[in-house]
Every structure is written in structure tokens, then in C-alpha cells.
């Protein structure tokens, strides 16, 4: 079975860089990122590896909802300027890059989904909770900074919902980190409790007469936001990749 290690480039690099007291100091960044990648390869022993980077194009999510990721701190200029050289350095270690047009998340989700559909296994190196919705047993998530797998069971326990309800949960509760609104007035606890009873977003909205008047009012008024949030949180799994698996195979 092919095992593909898929590294969320900026998720890894920005956190490594954030350990620097001065955000404009990129000295030694190449070495620190290379060391992290070597550690990942040694531990997971994949047959293939790629590091996926966000692109400069406007995300379809931003087009759909202008406030998406609003207020997020921009990448330090020195870090942005250092990325081309970093990518070259990593390619010398056989860690080749895939540059997304916009968000890396959709490319990572597409790659992982294609792999498992062809009897492969994907290990996504990222702390981005959006990948929780990829629930196939052959898609795993690895937190490099805690040196631990992020399991579906852990996410179920933390959120208080089942794996099939992750998208519905975020559509209700929102995601403050990405400025996904959810339904105003419906927080994580309420979202979890509602999904325990009604099982899905569609069932909930088809049964508002069974919900308390105060909560039903919030849900009715926030219906469009729930629909919008549902679209925003969904990962795309059919992005054109324009890449061949063989480009990312590691030498034996």
C-alpha cells in the first residue's frame, strides 16, 4: 500500500517560525523546517511525500463570504520572501512542493481522498481542525508539535458529536479561527446538544417546532448563515492537481 505523507506547508512553517522572538528573523529557518521534515519521514516511513502551500489567488470561500478569515495576522514579510528558497531546499531532501492556487486545504483534501479511493493511505501533517471531516479510516492526521496522532475519536469526544456530524456542528457553532459565522447565539455546547437530538442540520431545520421558542427563533433567523457556514467549512475533494504520484515517490 502506498503511504503518502502530506504536509500542510504554512501550518508547519508558520508555527516553527513563530518560536522566533523577532518575526523578521528567518536565519536558520531552512534548517529547522528541514529537521522537522526529516523527523516526519523517519517516523512515518512513507512511500511518497509532498508539502502543499497556499497560493495567492482569492479563495472561493472569500468570494462567497467577504469576512472569511478576516483579521487574520498576515504572514511576516521576511517569512514570505524566504519561502522560494525554502521550497528549493526541501526539494533537495526529496520533499517536493505542490502550490495551490488559493487554499492548500482543498488540495490536501483532494490528494488524500484520491489516495484512499485507490487503496492508498494518507497521513496529513496539520493541526487544522477542518481536516476532521475527512473520516476515512485510511486518512490519518499527525500533530508534529505534540508528536501525536489526532484521532477521530478524540475529536468526537472534544466536540460532543459523531464523525458524520462534524460539518453540521461547524455550520451551527461556527469557527472563530476562520471567521465562519455559524448561527448567532448558538455556541458549541448548544450545537452539540441539538445534534444529539436531531442528528443532522436538515433534520433540525425540519423540526424547529420541537425546539424551545428562544432557540428556535435564533435558528430561524440564522438559517441563511447556517447554510453559508455549511458551504464554507466543506473541503473540496475534486480540485485539479496537475501532478503525478510518481513525482512524490521517495527513493528506496
Curated annotation (Swiss-Prot):
> Which SUPFAM superfamilies does the record cross-reference, listed alphabetically?
5' to 3' exonuclease, C-terminal subdomain, PIN domain-like
Residue numbers binding K(+): 172-173, 181, 183, 186
Tell me which residues make up the 5'-3' exonuclease domain. 162-250
Q: Which GO terms describe its molecular function?
A: 5'-3' exonuclease activity; 5'-flap endonuclease activity; DNA binding; magnesium ion binding; potassium ion binding
What are the names of the required cofactors?
Mg(2+); K(+)
> Which CDD domains does the record cross-reference, listed alphabetically?
H3TH_53EXO, PIN_53EXO
| Alphabetical GO biological process terms | DNA replication, Okazaki fragment processing
Task: Identify the residues that bind Mg(2+).
Answer: 105
Query: What Pfam family is a match for this entry?
Result: 5_3_exonuc
Q: Cite the cofactor comment.
A: Binds 2 Mg(2+) per subunit. Only one magnesium ion has a direct interaction with the protein, the other interactions are indirect.
Does the keyword Hydrolase belong to this entry?
yes
Q: Which Gene3D superfamilies is this protein grouped with?
A: 5' to 3' exonuclease, C-terminal subdomain, 5'-nuclease
**Record's keyword terms, sorted:** DNA-binding, Endonuclease, Hydrolase, Magnesium, Metal-binding, Nuclease, Potassium
| Segments of this protein annotated with the region Interaction with DNA | 185-190
Q: What function does this protein fulfil?
A: Has flap endonuclease activity. During DNA replication, flap endonucleases cleave the 5'-overhanging flap structure that is generated by displacement synthesis when DNA polymerase encounters the 5'-end of a downstream Okazaki fragment.
For this entry, the protein name equals: Flap endonuclease Xni
Amino acid at each position: 500500500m502506498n503511504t503518502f505523507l502530506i504536509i500542510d506547508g504554512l501550518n508547519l512553517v508558520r508555527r516553527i517560525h513563530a518560536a522566533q522572538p523577532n518575526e523578521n528573523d528567518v536565519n536558520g529557518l531552512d534548517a529547522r523546517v528541514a529537521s522537522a521534515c526529516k523527523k516526519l519521514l523517519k517516523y512515518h516511513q512513507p512511500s511518497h511525500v509532498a508539502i502543499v502551500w497556499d497560493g495567492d489567488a482569492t479563495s472561493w470561500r472569500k468570494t462567497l463570504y467577504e469576512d472569511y478569515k478576516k483579521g487574520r495576522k498576515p504572514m511576516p514579510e521576511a517569512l514570505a520572501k524566504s519561502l522560494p528558497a525554502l521550497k528549493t531546499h526541501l526539494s533537495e531532501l526529496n520533499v517536493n512542493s505542490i502550490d495551490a492556487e488559493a487554499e492548500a486545504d482543498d488540495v490536501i483534501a483532494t490528494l488524500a481522498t484520491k489516495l484512499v479511493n485507490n487503496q492508498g493511505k494518507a497521513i496529513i501533517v496539520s493541526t487544522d481542525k477542518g481536516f476532521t471531516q475527512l473520516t476515512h479510516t485510511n486518512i490519518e492526521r499527525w500533530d508534529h508539535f505534540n508528536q501525536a496522532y489526532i484521532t477521530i475519536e478524540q475529536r468526537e469526544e472534544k466536540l460532543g458529536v459523531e464523525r458524520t456530524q462534524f460539518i453540521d456542528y461547524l455550520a451551527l457553532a461556527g469557527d472563530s479561527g476562520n471567521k465562519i459565522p455559524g448561527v448567532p447565539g448558538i455556541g458549541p455546547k448548544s450545537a452539540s446538544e441539538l445534534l444529539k437530538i436531531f442528528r443532522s442540520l436538515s433534520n433540525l431545520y425540519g423540526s424547529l417546532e420541537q425546539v424551545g421558542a428562544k432557540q428556535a427563533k435564533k435558528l430561524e433567523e440564522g438559517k441563511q448563515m447556517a447554510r453559508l457556514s455549511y458551504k464554507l467549512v466543506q473541503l473540496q475533494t475534486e480540485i485539479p492537481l496537475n501532478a503525478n504520484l510518481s513525482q512524490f515517490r521517495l527513493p528506496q
